[in-house]
Protein backbone atom coordinates (compact mmCIF):
# COMPACT_ATOMS: atom_id res chain seq x y z
CA UNK A 1 0.00 0.00 0.00
CA UNK A 2 1.37 3.40 -0.91
CA UNK A 3 1.47 6.50 1.22
CA UNK A 4 -1.30 9.04 0.78
CA UNK A 5 0.71 12.05 -0.38
CA UNK A 6 3.91 10.55 -1.74
CA UNK A 7 4.97 7.95 -4.22
CA UNK A 8 6.72 5.78 -1.65
CA UNK A 9 5.50 2.61 -0.06
CA UNK A 10 4.95 2.37 3.64
CA UNK A 11 7.30 0.37 5.79
CA UNK A 12 5.79 -2.54 7.62
CA UNK A 13 6.27 -2.86 11.34
CA UNK A 14 6.08 -5.74 13.73
CA UNK A 15 2.73 -7.10 14.85
CA UNK A 16 1.61 -7.18 18.44
CA UNK A 17 1.58 -10.72 19.84
CA UNK A 18 -1.88 -12.23 19.85
CA UNK A 19 -3.28 -12.74 23.32
CA UNK A 20 -6.73 -13.63 24.59
CA UNK A 21 -6.24 -12.69 28.22
CA UNK A 22 -3.99 -10.33 30.15
CA UNK A 23 -0.76 -11.75 31.56
CA UNK A 24 -0.94 -13.14 35.08
CA UNK A 25 1.59 -10.61 36.38
CA UNK A 26 -0.85 -7.81 35.56
CA UNK A 27 -3.81 -8.61 37.78
CA UNK A 28 -5.58 -5.27 38.23
CA UNK A 29 -9.27 -4.76 38.94
CA UNK A 30 -11.31 -3.55 35.93
CA UNK A 31 -12.96 -0.80 37.98
CA UNK A 32 -9.57 0.51 39.11
CA UNK A 33 -8.41 0.66 35.49
CA UNK A 34 -11.56 2.47 34.39
CA UNK A 35 -11.26 4.96 37.25
CA UNK A 36 -7.63 5.64 36.33
CA UNK A 37 -8.57 6.12 32.65
CA UNK A 38 -11.23 8.69 33.55
CA UNK A 39 -8.86 10.40 35.99
CA UNK A 40 -6.16 10.73 33.31
CA UNK A 41 -8.70 12.03 30.79
CA UNK A 42 -9.80 14.71 33.23
CA UNK A 43 -6.15 15.72 33.62
CA UNK A 44 -6.12 16.39 29.86
CA UNK A 45 -4.50 13.28 28.41
CA UNK A 46 -5.55 11.92 25.00
CA UNK A 47 -6.59 8.26 24.67
CA UNK A 48 -3.24 7.22 23.19
CA UNK A 49 -1.37 9.00 25.98
CA UNK A 50 -3.61 7.28 28.53
CA UNK A 51 -2.65 3.90 27.10
CA UNK A 52 1.04 4.78 27.32
CA UNK A 53 0.66 6.02 30.90
CA UNK A 54 -1.11 2.82 31.95
CA UNK A 55 1.52 0.73 30.22
CA UNK A 56 4.42 2.58 31.83
CA UNK A 57 3.08 3.64 35.24
CA UNK A 58 0.12 1.33 35.63
CA UNK A 59 -2.62 1.34 38.23
CA UNK A 60 -1.56 1.11 41.86
CA UNK A 61 1.98 0.33 40.73
CA UNK A 62 1.00 -2.60 38.49
CA UNK A 63 1.46 -1.99 34.74
CA UNK A 64 -1.46 -2.60 32.39
CA UNK A 65 -0.06 -3.84 29.06
CA UNK A 66 -3.38 -3.69 27.20
CA UNK A 67 -6.50 -1.93 28.45
CA UNK A 68 -8.78 -3.83 26.09
CA UNK A 69 -7.52 -7.20 27.31
CA UNK A 70 -7.83 -6.17 30.94
CA UNK A 71 -11.28 -4.56 30.77
CA UNK A 72 -12.85 -5.83 27.56
CA UNK A 73 -13.29 -2.21 26.40
CA UNK A 74 -11.13 0.25 24.51
CA UNK A 75 -9.97 3.45 26.18
CA UNK A 76 -12.32 5.52 24.02
CA UNK A 77 -15.27 3.28 24.96
CA UNK A 78 -14.49 3.77 28.65
CA UNK A 79 -14.35 7.53 28.11
CA UNK A 80 -17.68 7.52 26.23
CA UNK A 81 -19.38 5.59 29.04
CA UNK A 82 -18.16 8.09 31.62
CA UNK A 83 -18.83 11.20 29.51
CA UNK A 84 -15.15 12.15 29.57
CA UNK A 85 -14.45 12.06 25.83
CA UNK A 86 -13.06 15.00 23.89
CA UNK A 87 -15.12 17.18 21.60
CA UNK A 88 -13.01 16.15 18.59
CA UNK A 89 -11.52 12.74 17.77
CA UNK A 90 -7.84 12.54 18.62
CA UNK A 91 -6.53 12.08 15.07
CA UNK A 92 -8.55 15.01 13.77
CA UNK A 93 -7.45 17.19 16.68
CA UNK A 94 -3.77 16.40 16.06
CA UNK A 95 -4.08 17.23 12.36
CA UNK A 96 -5.82 20.51 13.17
CA UNK A 97 -3.03 21.45 15.58
CA UNK A 98 -0.49 20.68 12.88
CA UNK A 99 -2.39 22.76 10.32
CA UNK A 100 -2.50 25.71 12.72
CA UNK A 101 1.26 25.48 13.30
CA UNK A 102 1.90 25.26 9.55
CA UNK A 103 -0.41 28.21 8.81
CA UNK A 104 1.36 30.35 11.41
CA UNK A 105 4.70 29.31 9.91
CA UNK A 106 3.45 30.26 6.44
CA UNK A 107 2.39 33.69 7.73
CA UNK A 108 5.94 34.28 8.95
CA UNK A 109 7.61 32.64 5.91
CA UNK A 110 5.46 33.19 2.81
CA UNK A 111 8.10 31.90 0.41
CA UNK A 112 8.38 28.46 1.98
CA UNK A 113 6.99 26.31 -0.84
CA UNK A 114 7.72 22.99 0.84
CA UNK A 115 5.66 23.79 3.91
CA UNK A 116 2.96 25.32 1.74
CA UNK A 117 2.52 21.90 0.18
CA UNK A 118 2.64 20.27 3.62
CA UNK A 119 -0.18 22.58 4.71
CA UNK A 120 -2.22 21.67 1.63
CA UNK A 121 -1.71 17.96 2.29
CA UNK A 122 -2.59 18.32 5.97
CA UNK A 123 -5.76 20.26 5.24
CA UNK A 124 -6.68 17.65 2.64
CA UNK A 125 -6.35 14.94 5.28
CA UNK A 126 -8.46 17.01 7.67
CA UNK A 127 -11.25 17.38 5.12
CA UNK A 128 -11.15 13.66 4.42
CA UNK A 129 -11.39 12.86 8.14
CA UNK A 130 -14.21 15.37 8.64
CA UNK A 131 -16.18 13.58 5.92
CA UNK A 132 -15.53 10.29 7.70
CA UNK A 133 -16.61 11.52 11.14
CA UNK A 134 -19.47 13.81 10.04
CA UNK A 135 -22.78 12.67 11.47
CA UNK A 136 -21.19 10.19 13.87
CA UNK A 137 -18.71 12.05 16.06
CA UNK A 138 -19.13 15.47 14.44
CA UNK A 139 -22.20 17.55 13.64
CA UNK A 140 -23.74 17.22 10.20
CA UNK A 141 -23.01 20.90 9.61
CA UNK A 142 -19.32 20.73 10.60
CA UNK A 143 -16.88 22.04 8.02
CA UNK A 144 -13.18 22.68 8.48
CA UNK A 145 -11.78 26.18 8.39
CA UNK A 146 -8.60 27.57 9.86
CA UNK A 147 -10.45 30.11 12.00
CA UNK A 148 -12.85 27.49 13.36
CA UNK A 149 -9.99 25.10 14.16
CA UNK A 150 -8.07 27.84 15.93
CA UNK A 151 -11.13 28.75 18.02
CA UNK A 152 -11.84 25.12 18.95
CA UNK A 153 -8.29 24.31 19.99
CA UNK A 154 -7.47 27.44 21.97
UniProtKB/Swiss-Prot annotation:
Residues 1-10 have a biased composition (Basic residues). Keywords: Ribonucleoprotein, Ribosomal protein. Residues 1-32 are annotated as: Disordered. Transmembrane segments: none annotated. GO terms for biological process: translation. One of its GO terms (cellular component) is cytosolic small ribosomal subunit. SMART domains: Ribosomal_S13_N (SM01386), Ribosomal_S15 (SM01387). GO terms for molecular function: small ribosomal subunit rRNA binding; structural constituent of ribosome. Residues 21-32 have a biased composition (Acidic residues). Belongs to the universal ribosomal protein uS15 family. PANTHER family: RIBOSOMAL PROTEIN S15P/S13E, SMALL RIBOSOMAL SUBUNIT PROTEIN US15. Part of the 30S ribosomal subunit. This is Small ribosomal subunit protein uS15.
Amino acid sequence: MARMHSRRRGSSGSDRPTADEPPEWSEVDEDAIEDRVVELAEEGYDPSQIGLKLRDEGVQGVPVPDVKLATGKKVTEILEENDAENELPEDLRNLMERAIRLREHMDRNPGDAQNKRALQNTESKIRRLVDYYRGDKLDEEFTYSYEDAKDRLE
